């Protein structure tokens, strides 16, 4: 079966920590698979993910529009449209928007645990615009 996901028909999640919004296209709830998690993210200027890592999961960002920095063990590097960022499992990382940012992300497999290294548990909390709460694991 082929799935077609339309962005305007999918639930939007807003981070409890201001400045981040995401829409999932592929996840357990939408496609009944846990092999990967995929969606788009919007960051306002200066919004950032916490410094974190994912156990048992590879993480990819493809920058569509805007500019950001990626922090990892290699230092802090600028990224922009057309750049693909690959974060191996268990590598600490942070993405910070230096201007409004739009990117596609996917994580595989979708059976992972996120560990916050700098930040709070609130960094993992997202509210659906319909009022339900989604907590990243």
Regions found by a protein language model. Give the residues of each.
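A cytosolic small-molecule/anion-sensing beta-strand core signal
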Residues: 64-65, 80-81, 99
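A short, N-terminal "cap"/entry segment at the start of jelly-roll beta-barrel domains
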Residues: 1-36, 118-137
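Short acidic-glycine-tyrosine-enriched beta hairpin
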Residues: 74-89
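Short strand-coil-strand connectors
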Residues: 71-75, 98
